[in-house]
Amino acid sequence: MKKRIVSALLALTLLVLLPCGALAAGTTELDGTAAYLTSTVTRPELGSVSGDWTVIGLARSACRVPDSYFSDYAQRVEQTVKDCAGVLSERKYTEYSRVILALTAIGKNPSNVGGYNLLRPLGDYEKTVYQGINGAIWALIALDRSRR
């Protein structure tokens, strides 16, 4: 009876510890990916798909990224929003959604970016769905993230 209990405990211990090696390897891979992204996308910009998505991915990961990487991005977004008087696109409202996701990922408020509320355009149903269902889907995701 004692052997069965010890065997069961050993098996349970192995099952519990089995994912630990995979998690450690995953962390190493994740850090390598983060290093690659920050060296490849050195100045993420609004309207640059790789820039916005890179900020989202890095901010939502557990990787260490210099604070200046995100604060510089936020400053560039604010300047771009001011330069275009808050109109990121007349037709592609997924632009708003993507920027909102990036800003919320770094803890910024998308309802006041250079004095402009980037959430407001997503309330225009016709323009939001102009790109099809993706427009509506990304708008809902962006609006949801902005409330957290």
Can you say where each PLM-predicted feature lies in the sequence?
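Short regulatory/linker helices and ligand/cofactor-binding micro-motifs at input modules
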Residues: 13
